[in-house]
């Protein structure tokens, strides 16, 4: 039998039960985004979770700790490990409210961590801006200023620094203020006196005239700030050498400050071409020696068998034989004969073609500077390279030994090599 029709709103008793629909998974609060709730189904048993309970007695004991207070909180905070730069903050506790900050962008970029190497570097702070950490440093700076002022007073008052506790009279005026009264007239007098001293040194050979000097005005900052325009004028050497003493290279005849003036040989190197000037005078020029005139006739003497002698005169022509011509008379110099004088500009400027004899004059100054004068040209002599092997000075004579045999004489070992360079600035007329 068929079942009676049921009303449309009520299901039949034998109809299967529909499956329960799953609820949508949504977090209850924004803070529980990581917590997912599972749907509850009546036929499935839920798993129980174990949650330990804290005993109430222990809880009460912690609350009634006698060491609790502000001091214990400071001690615990000091014993807690410090966070290292670059560590990420921990996750928020479950008890925190799960509210997001409204002004925080969740897609923002994370700040870059500071490298650990930069943590141990010194801060970029000038030393002048750092304040002294204690009164000890301040007293130390004040003592340094006082010592500098005393050193300046010792220098100006000619006080012996080895006896700083010796009684003395200090000036009533600061010596730094005396410089303001230094007038231009005093500066010009000092300038002329310094110039005269330099000229005397150059004349004596103690100082070279090729050294450049410049005038510099030396004035303190206090004078410029207070309107003082006058400053002390001094000669300042513009060369890089701060030591004004003559170097060992400019003392060619000295070895370890000992003058080699006895039984010493020196090797002086001269240039291949020597500069010379036309110093031949234009007056009292001697006439050159003229050769004797050629004979026009030839005289012959013939001895006859009788013993008589006959002389014949034959004129010299182109057809005359050479045998018939007389030999030239020998050239003999008498005491009154003219000897030509050699002037510095007459010979070629080379060492090989120079006339033998006296070469020049050597001048050695007290300062050690040496100048060789050849003719009218002066040469500056300086020490050359040191001897690196054995050198001997020898003299050869072609006919000095027995039976007119050649002989060699050893004179000695040269003490030093010297180099002669012409002083071009003093040559005039080249």
Swiss-Prot record:
It comes from the Eukaryota. One of its GO terms (molecular function) is DNA binding. Residues 1-10 have a biased composition (Pro residues). Residues 35-44, 296-313 have a biased composition (Low complexity). Keywords: DNA-directed RNA polymerase, Nucleus, Transcription. Pfam families: RNA_pol_Rpc4 (PF05132). GO terms for biological process: transcription by RNA polymerase III; tRNA transcription by RNA polymerase III. Residues 93-106 have a biased composition (Polar residues). Its main location: nucleus. It is found in: Nucleus. GO terms for cellular component: RNA polymerase III complex. InterPro entries: RPC4. Residues 1-108, 218-240, 283-313 are annotated as: Disordered. PANTHER family: DNA-DIRECTED RNA POLYMERASE III, DNA-DIRECTED RNA POLYMERASE III SUBUNIT RPC4. DNA-dependent RNA polymerase catalyzes the transcription of DNA into RNA using the four ribonucleoside triphosphates as substrates. Specific component of RNA polymerase III which synthesizes small RNAs, such as 5S rRNA and tRNAs. Belongs to the eukaryotic RPC4/POLR3D RNA polymerase subunit family. Component of the RNA polymerase III (Pol III) complex consisting of 17 subunits. This is DNA-directed RNA polymerase III subunit rpc4.
């Amino acid at each position: 039998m068929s079942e009676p029709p049921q009303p449309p709103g009520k299901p039949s008793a034998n109809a299967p039960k529909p499956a329960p629909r799953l609820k949508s998974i949504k977090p209850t609060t924004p803070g529980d985004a990581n917590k997912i709730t599972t749907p509850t189904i009546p036929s499935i048993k839920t798993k129980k979770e174990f949650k330990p309970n804290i005993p109430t007695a222990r809880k009460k004991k912690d609350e009634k700790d006698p060491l609790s207070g502000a001091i214990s909180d400071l001690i615990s905070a000091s014993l807690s490990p410090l966070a290292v730069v670059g560590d990420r903050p921990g996750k928020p506790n479950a008890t925190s409210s799960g509210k997001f900050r409204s002004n925080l962008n969740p897609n923002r970029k994370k700040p870059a961590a500071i490298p650990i190497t930069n943590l141990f570097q010194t801060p970029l702070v000038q030393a002048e801006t750092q304040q002294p950490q204690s009164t000890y440093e301040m007293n130390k700076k004040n003592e340094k200023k006082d010592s500098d002022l005393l050193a300046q007073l010792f220098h100006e008052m000619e006080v012996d620094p080895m006896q700083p506790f010796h009684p003395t009279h200090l000036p009533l005026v600061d010596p730094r203020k005396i410089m303001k009264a230094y007038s231009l007239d005093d500066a010009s007098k000092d300038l002329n006196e310094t110039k005269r001293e330099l000229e005397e040194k150059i004349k004596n050979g103690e100082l070279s005239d090729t050294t450049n000097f410049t005038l510099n005005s030396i004035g303190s900052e206090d004078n410029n700030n207070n309107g003082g325009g006058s400053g002390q004028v001094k000669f300042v050497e513009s060369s890089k050498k701060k030591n004004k003493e003559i170097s060992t290279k400019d003392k060619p005849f000295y070895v370890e400050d000992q003058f080699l003036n006895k039984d010493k040989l020196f090797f002086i190197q001269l240039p291949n071409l020597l500069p010379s000037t036309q110093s031949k005078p234009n007056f009292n020029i001697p006439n050159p020696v003229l050769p004797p005139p050629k004979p026009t006739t030839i005289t012959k003497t013939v001895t006859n068998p009788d013993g008589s002698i006959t002389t014949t005169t034959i004129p010299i022509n182109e057809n005359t034989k050479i045998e018939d011509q007389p030999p030239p008379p020998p050239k003999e110099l008498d005491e009154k004969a003219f000897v030509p004088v050699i002037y510095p500009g007459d010979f070629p400027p080379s060492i090989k073609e120079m006339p033998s004899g006296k070469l020049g004059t050597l001048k050695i100054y007290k300062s050690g500077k040496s100048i060789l004068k050849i003719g009218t040209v002066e040469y500056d002599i300086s020490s050359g390279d040191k001897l690196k092997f054995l050198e001997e000075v020898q003299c050869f004579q072609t006919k000095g030994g027995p039976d007119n045999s050649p002989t060699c004489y050893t004179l000695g070992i040269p003490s030093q090599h010297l180099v002669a360079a012409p002083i071009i600035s003093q040559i005039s007329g080249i």
